[in-house]
Amino acid sequence: MGCRTFWQMTQPIESYVGRCVSQSIAGSGVSPKSVNYIVFSTMDNNLRHLDVNFARNILEELGLVNCVPVFVSMQQCASSLAALNYARGLFLDPNVNHVLVVAFDFVVEDADRIQPFALFGDAVTSCMMVRGAETGLSLLSYGVNMDFAGLLGRDNFESRKRLVLTTQDGALKESSTHLDDVEMCFSTNFYKPISLFNAGVSGIKRNRLCVETLNTRAHCGNCDWMLNLMHYQECVGLTRGKKYLVQAFAPGFFACGLLESC
């Protein structure tokens, strides 16, 4: 089915989040005191497993003393793209210069890892959004929609296809992008046959689909698109001026965004 191994967290989630975010801060060269917001995202069912002082503990550990925490959820594995878009909107405030975006997902009971559509692994991903950055990626557009029948597990091929195409066409139009202009698509790590099926539904050619971390990490919820993007960036590299599509599939939801390398 395309996945050989998965990663499992053996320590409290805060330790993994702190380590990942610390690396993003160090890699950006931004002082922790200069970060204005940190936007977290995870799947709905993980919210009840977080410590009541989760955000406070992360802020204290990393020295984010001027940073406002925000949590985005309720869109399952599509929540991280909602968080990315929310973070983009924060820059409408001229006083905001640095925003951290963090996605994490984990499975509490191992028996829940194997699902009909994916094998679940644990992961944390994060990135720093910087006003006026001369290098990196820029979010050009974003789209999300919900299929209520899918949320109830009663959707069908036609309703899923309609959900994907309506959302994706809107995001492409907003960024004045044709699908043929997309260099690569970073998508959700469902079982490989399902990932290929989803790519076909959304018009993505097989050689333009990147779900490479499926093999070693399985499906890590909200982290998949960023894990695949990072893998591609490390192994192949992003081309300045090229556009990249990111996708997030979830029961009843589909979200996507257009990124441009600068």
PLM regions with names:
Residues 1-13, 111-170, 249, 258-262:
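Condensing-enzyme catalytic core mediating Claisen C-C bond formation in acyl metabolism
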Residues 1-37, 148-183, 193-206, 228-232, ...:
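Conserved active-site "lid/cap" helical segment
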Residues 3-9, 43-44, 69-73, 112-114, ...:
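A short glycine/serine-rich beta->alpha loop
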Residues 32-46, 58:
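Membrane helical hairpin/interfacial module
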Residues 35, 96-97, 182, 241:
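Short, high-confidence coil segments that cap the C-terminus of an alpha-helix
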Residues 41, 99-105, 129, 246-249:
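Short beta-strand segments
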Residues 47, 52, 65, 73-92, ...:
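Claisen-condensing/thiolase-fold acyl-transfer catalytic domains that form or cleave C-C bonds
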Residues 92-117, 124, 252-254:
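Phosphate-binding/catalytic loop of phosphoryl-transfer enzymes
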